[in-house]
Each structure stands twice: as C-alpha cells, then as structure tokens.
Amino acid sequence: MIDINVNNIFFRSYSVDPNSGHAIYVFDSTYLPASDEIGDKQVYDLLINALMDRLVMKLPQAPYSLVIFSSGFSQRKISWVYGIKMFAKLPKETKFYLQKIFIVHESFFVRSVYQVISNAMNFNFLDSKDSQHDFPSLVHVLDLTSLSELIDITRLRISLNVYLYDYQIREHINVPEEYYNRLTPLAIRQYRQLVFDKIFKKLQNDALLCELIFQKPGNYKKVNIFLDIIKRNNYIDLSQWDIYSLASVWLNYFIKNKAKPLIPIELIPLPIVDDLKFTSETFRKIIKFNQYQDLFMVIIPFFNRIIAHGESTKHDSRTLSKALTPALCKEKLSMMTNDRLAIGSRYIKNLLDFFPEIAKEISSPPSSVSSSSTIPVLPKPRKSSPTRYSELGCLTLPRSRSPSPQRSVTSPTYTPVALQNTPVLKPKSSSRNVSSPSFNAKPPLPIKAVTRPQLSLTSNSNTDLALASSSTDTLSSPTKTPSADSLPLSNSSTDLTISDNIKEMVKDEPAKDKNSVETDIFVQQFESLTLVQNAKIKKFDKELQEKKKKNETTSKTADKFSQKGYSDIKASNKVSRLAALYEERLQGLQVMNEMKQRW
C-alpha cells in the first residue's frame, strides 16, 4: 500500500512573508505519488482527484503566500496534464487569498504548465497592472540559497527530498549573515540541546536493531546537509534521516566536538592493565579532569546495550570500542595516530567491560560527601558578591536557615551533586525541590525551571545531557567552573527552559494529518481501488512494470529529454505512441475548457 500523508504535501510553515506579513504555506511536490508506483492510469486519476479534493479543503481563508518545491514533478515524471488538473481544482475564490507564489527548483514541467495555462486563459501572472487583483504574482527561485534572500527559510519545514535535490545544484546553502544573529545565544544552545536529545532518543530506540552502528558511516550528502541545518538553526524533521546518518552526526559532531575529550589518552598510564582496579582508577582521573561523569553515566550503558544485542548489531566490546575511539579520544584517523588510537581503543574496551562495577563504586558513597567540607572545593567567584556565588548554590542556601527536619533530610541527596561535581540534579528530586515552598521565599536570581519545570525535554530520564558543541562551550555562565561545559540545559542549577518556539523547530516524528477520520476514509477508498478484481487491469499493470524495469536497465542517460526521435520508434509502437500523445492533448484541452467556464 502507498502511504500518502496530505500534511507532508501542503502545510503551513512558521515563517511569514517579510513584505506583506502574510502566513507562508508550503506545497512539497516530492511527496506526490508517481504514476509508476500506482501502475494503472485510471486508478492514478482517481487518486489525484481525491488528493486534490483534500488539499482544497486545507486551503486557508485568509491572505497567504505559497512556496512550491517543484522538483517532485520532474523527478516523479508527472504529466503536464495532471498539473492542469491540479490547477483546475482550485476554487475561484482562492485567487483573493493567494497573494504570491515562490516557485523553487523550477523545472520544464512548471514552465510548460505555466505557458499552457497562460495561453489558454489569456492572462499573464506577471502583469501587475491588469491582474494584480485577480491572480498572484510569481517569483521564480533557482535554489534554496536564493530563497533565503527572500524569506526566512529557517522556519520552513523543508523535506530531505528537497535538500537532496538542492544539493545537486549547490552543495552548501549560503544564507545572509543576519541569519546567524536571529537567535540569542541561549536560544541557540536550547536548539542544539534539543537536537542532541532527540537524536539520542532515536538512537536508543533504533540503534539496537542496526548492524554495525557507529562503524558504518552515514550518507555523506545527508550528513553534510544535517550539519548545515544545525549551523543555520533550521527547522528539522529527524524522522526523514536514516539511523546511520544520525549516528554519525551524534558521535562525530556533538560528542567529538566537546571542549575536552571524553577519554584523554594522556591520562591513560602505560602499560595498560586489563583489570577493574586499573580501569576504575584511571576513570576517576578522567572524570576529575573533564567533569563529564553524568554524560558517561548515560552513554556508556547505551553502548553496553548495543553490545548486549550483538546478534542484531554485530558488535562486541572490541569492535565497538574501535569505532568509538576517534570520537571519544578526539583523535584523527591517520598513520601518525595509530599508536594513540590503539591505546584509547584498549582502554575503552576495558571501560565498557567493567563499567557496571565502576558505576556502582562511583554512585555508592554520596552520603559521606554531603558534609560541609565539600563547600570549599568550589572555585571562588570572580567577584566576592554572594548573589553571584549563590546562583549555583541557591538551592542549598535556604536550607541553612530552615529549622525544619524534613528539609534537612532531603538536602544530603541534593547538595553533593550540586556542589562537588557541578552539574546534574536528578529529575525527580528537582521536581520536588522546585515545588517546595522554601525556595519561593527569597530566590537570589529567578530560575526559569521554577515557573515552568514541565518544559524540560526529558524530565524523567537521564538523557538530558550537556550540549556537545564547541560553540556552546564559550557561552558565559554566572560562575566559571571547570565543568561548565558539562552542565545540562535542564534539571540543573542554571536551568535553561526550552521555549515552545524552539521545541517546534525540531521534530522526531513525521507530521500527522489533523483530520484523522477523513484520512482513514481516504486510505480505505484508495485500498478499495487497488483491490479491484479486474484481470485486464492486472495484466496492464504487469506490462507497465516490465517496461519500467527494461527502461531502467537499458537507458542510463542523465538527460531529462528523450534521445529517441520518431524514426527510432518501432513500427509496431508508433501508432500507440501517437495515440497516447493525442489522448493526452485531448485531456489537457478538455480540462482547460472546464477551467475557463469555472474561472
């Protein structure tokens, strides 16, 4: 069955037309069904008619601009007749609301339909004097770079199909410099934190079923496109990317680009001893150096789950450690670094093998560290102002004044994490402390999590990790500590609540059609059409599929236009080819006559 989601074809974006202020809608032709996928012309006609009826119902009843990604028409070899039919389906009233059309990746198909409609209806879209009140103005755009100069593309939901087509024209999307200043440093950090969390969540669900994850590289084009999207802080739908590309971005961009390497090779003493004591002592030195303990506590168990599912992932501790070493040790793959990579790979293998015991040793004695002797461990602030210093320790200050025994009981589980290791507050204890009335009495500085703690992306899990990007490591924090890089964006003393606008820009699930009942009916109707018991149609479908396979193997030309002339056609097929062209022309004329009467 062919899955057609109307919400992917026509939808409202978060961007607006900068000139008129009208909302911008998007028509993505790459999601239109191809006639070759259906196999039968009659069924395809019915499908296009039903699809256009659904799209007409979604048209807004207010002025708007429309962005058309037209590459799907040529890629899916949709006949120009269907372009005329789609235009004829539009009600006459829509011309009052549709103000401007941006046609991106214009193809021969779009030019043909535009010329045919213009000649048949005897009007010109670009004539601002005669038809500016009757028909929208057209703006022909070559690629996404040109589109970025007209509207804000960071708020558009651009599909991966469109990005891949645009990549053939230009490998990188060059946007105006002002794009990088539209978000504040806090919003940029929130955006990239959200991308990191969403990718990690997807990896936890899907990586256990993928063979040689983190070893097989992702698609080069897709990875480059993804990195460009992050650089622009663009809207992104993660459901369109394959798991290997996401794993490459997560490991080689977020993890590898942290301010300090997760496994510094310089801190691994030689010779390496493959036992628990040596591995544990070295690990304590490492986390004391980079303060990434909380990150380790989340990603290492995830790596061990990949090893546990070795039947599907084809990984053991040796192969996985070898794949992770360049990113975790922040080393390049070259002949000059082979010795260093061998050291890092051997230690990472031991760390994966002994980590359950190491995690128990590290997390077992938090109660003994909760004494007041841990307070001097914190570095002194740049200024001696107590308000600046209390931003990291603001949750512990009210406890010293409170005589309540109930509050003093809960403080040991919270204080050592906030004071000794700097970042991570457990989600459950964080939610209790925020709701406690003692923290609302005199907060030194307002904390966003107090007002909206429910906006934390992963409030009940430890996947709310530090942002692994070099750009975020330079963000200014109230108190400069060695572990400021490892502070999570939520559930921490400097809690950065992710705003609703930033949340809307990163999606990990495909868009769903709001009219679910109508969608089910539409799918049922289409299924009933495909299940018609007609021997003639089945035979015709089989012949079309055989012709399609034959054409794919014989014709490898990259030209969009056929290299065969009329004399090249076999005598037995000349009549049928001419008949098909003549029938197509008659259908186009019939549709245009009907359109004239309606418009």
From Swiss-Prot:
It holds the Pfam family RhoGAP. InterPro entries: CRAL-TRIO_dom, CRAL-TRIO_dom_sf, Rho_GTPase_activation_prot, RhoGAP_dom. Residues 181-359 form the Rho-GAP domain. SUPFAM superfamilies: GTPase activation domain, GAP (SSF48350). GO terms for molecular function: actinin binding; GTPase activator activity. Residues 362-447, 468-495, 543-563 are annotated as: Disordered. The record marks 215 as: Arginine finger. GO terms for cellular component: cytoplasm. GO terms for biological process: cell wall organization; regulation of cellular response to stress; regulation of unidimensional cell growth; small GTPase-mediated signal transduction. Residues 543-562 have a biased composition (Basic and acidic residues). May be involved in cell wall organization and biogenesis. Present with 1750 molecules/cell in log phase SD medium. This is Protein ECM25. It comes from Saccharomyces cerevisiae (strain ATCC 204508 / S288c). The gene is ECM25.
